[in-house]
Amino acid sequence: MGLKAHFRGSLPAGLIHLYTFPGGYCGMSAIENGLINVCLLVRQDTFQSASQPSPASVNQFIVWMGQQNPALGKWLSGAERIDESWLSISQIPFVTKQVVVNDILMAGDSAGLIAPVAGDGMGMALQAGRMASDVLGLYLTHQISAVDVRQRYSQLWWHTFGFRLRLSRVLQAFMLRPNWLTPGLMVMNAVPALGRLLVTHTRDTQLVRP
């Protein structure tokens, strides 16, 4: 499940700060009006067990999360939550989807949901919208058929995002499993170039054309 809230606190701009804890991870970034956007993803079973013996409680889970990662707990205790409560979402489908459904070209999360730790979902949605516009432009100018529209968009979408989605799911599997994450981080610390390589292959590092 995912949780999100806005805070007021100290956090350097221009960077995404990532904290891990057993069964999940939490990301922070500075946004407009001097606020900090805090989002986290956690396994449903981890959330439930951390909220016991009382009914599942977000606030109780946040306390538990801070105890698992002292650096994260220290930041949260020194920051002011602006939102009245945490926004939550569950049953997040990180599964393969159809890019064209009933002759409708899908974009954004409707086409494929990338793991937050590894991707720029909004950027992908904008890029897919541009791709759909380009393909439909060819159809409207009678250069390709309706069948070609479906085939071209699907092929272009998977060529652009397919590997990125698969790699993001592997990375997220490591992030949600402590027994995998610790040795994985040790390898990345020993080989810094590996981290840069992962960033390059999970995001579009090229400028979007006008």
Where are these regions (language model features)?
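FAD/FMN-dependent oxidoreductases across multiple families
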Residues: Q52-L136
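Conserved FAD-binding catalytic core of PHBH/FMO-like flavoproteins
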Residues: M1-Q67
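C-terminal helical "tail/cap" subdomain of flavin- and related membrane-associated enzymes
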Residues: D134-P210
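Short, structured loop/turn "capping" segments at alpha-beta junctions
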Residues: P12, K74-W75, F163-R164
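Short capping/connector residues at structural and topological boundaries
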Residues: P12, G23-C26, A30, I36, ...
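A general structural signal for short secondary-structure boundary/capping elements
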Residues: Y19-F21, Y25, I89, V199-T205
